Amino acid sequence: MMRLFAVLLCVVVLVPAASAQPAPQDRAPDDEVRQHLRTRIEAQRRGLDALAVEGETAQASAAVQAFYEDRQFAPVWVGPSGPTPAVDRLLTVLERADRDGLPPAAYYVDDLQALLNEIRAASGTDAGRLADLELLSTDAFLLYGSHLLTGRVSPTELEPSWNVEGRRGDLVSVLREAARTGAVAEALQSLRPPQSEYAHLKTALQRYRRLAARGGWPAVPDGESLKLGAHGPRVDSLRRRLAKTDDLTAERSAAPDSFGVALETAVVTFQERHGLEADGVVGPATRAALNVSADARAEQVAVNLERWRWLPQSLGRRHVLVNIAAFRLRVVEEGEDVLRMRAIIGRPYRQTPVFSGAISYLVLNPYWHVPHSIATKDKLPEIKKDPDYLARQQFEVLRGWGADAQPIDPSTIDWSRLSASNFPYRLRQRPGPLNALGQVKFMFPNRHSVYLHDTPTRGLFARAERSFSSGCVRVEKPIELAEYLLANQTQWAADRIQTALNTSAAERSVFLPEPVPVHLQYWTAWADADGTVHFRADVYQRDDAVHRALSDRVQ
């Protein structure tokens, strides 16, 4: 027996007086369906019962009610002859929801198909079953549309610190237009993220799912590192593995178990796509990435498609985009990258938060006002071990955080008596070559107290994995970024910036005439326009939670 459908009304229908209704044979099926819809939805509005999803409240019950009341309960998916072609078009779209990384089962595909088959087998005359189909189809459209528009998973449930305003839209209006034109697929297509990155990832998802369906790729067995000149069956496994993902495109060697130059080049290509040290040597890290299954990579792509659905309609005509998981910063203008650089992000226990803001000013030769947590956890132990630590590292000690706080002599403080619970001081590092913020910081005021900044520790940018900060983002090319942001201010030409940095140790704020949006996001997979797919390690261990939530049948 068929399961209860998503938007069936569990109501006790009050039968009107016979004189108030035309005889059944005098009424078209869609007229009877309209009456069923009116009775059920008005009962729901009066609180007599609720639209139900297999006994649960319908996912889009409020929108369903608003839609039908606005059109005087006229059906969309049912006509005088029964189900319309629009139902089939909707079903086709829903069956392809997995192309967006969404589970078709969440949109009642099996129930819709079974109900449609039942109605057509019975010549489509049962008004009650037609009303069931009508309500189920509408709820499926609205639910799928809402997931394309804002995501299936609530980012704030997974990340309480999430602070990005997502897209908004009037789904009832979209459905109304689809009902008017019959363009169901086009209406739902309009709800997808407009960014090209989303479309590229969709293509990547299909590619990796095809690879998985064909058996994936061979594993590279454990053993010593493989490099140029190596021989043996493990080299042949490596060759076949890299060919599956088109990292190895050169003609197959006459000696497939020999590690030649073409294979070394393919290894470097793979390493670059995965954010690994691109040395052409297959060590433990590279082998681990090679042996991640095609299914797992497809899931990773689906997770990152969802992350795009959480974002605003527009990131800004020009904007700064930090991919935390990739340790990269891009400056984008009119959809094109105009500046790229490496970045250093927060350690796993001091994670860089995901949020959006707007860079409104720069600070040249900044002081570093050490956060209380860092002062007590990191700096206080150093001070206790070495009385000269503060002077050598150019720190000042102030009592309190007010603007009028004055420096005090650190030698007058009994540091041994202090701890995190009774530390009343503020540490401030003077501008200069030792300053942790380097020569410039980029400010976008936010509740996380996070910003972009230079760093004197330049060597860390050479590392493949760059999670070394306390939450803020260190940028590889701070002067180039400053020059870009100040390019339209004639008084701040490149030479003037260098002069201000090199001839004065005084802190100076420079405000932008127009704030520039900045987005700190977390993507572990993305695809280029040429089809190159990139993956990164899940440094903050966030992918699994999104994947589990996406995989649930009902949210």
Segment roles from a protein language model:
Residues M1-L4:
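Positively charged n-region of N-terminal signal peptides that target proteins for export
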Residues P22-E165:
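Cationic-aromatic interfacial patches
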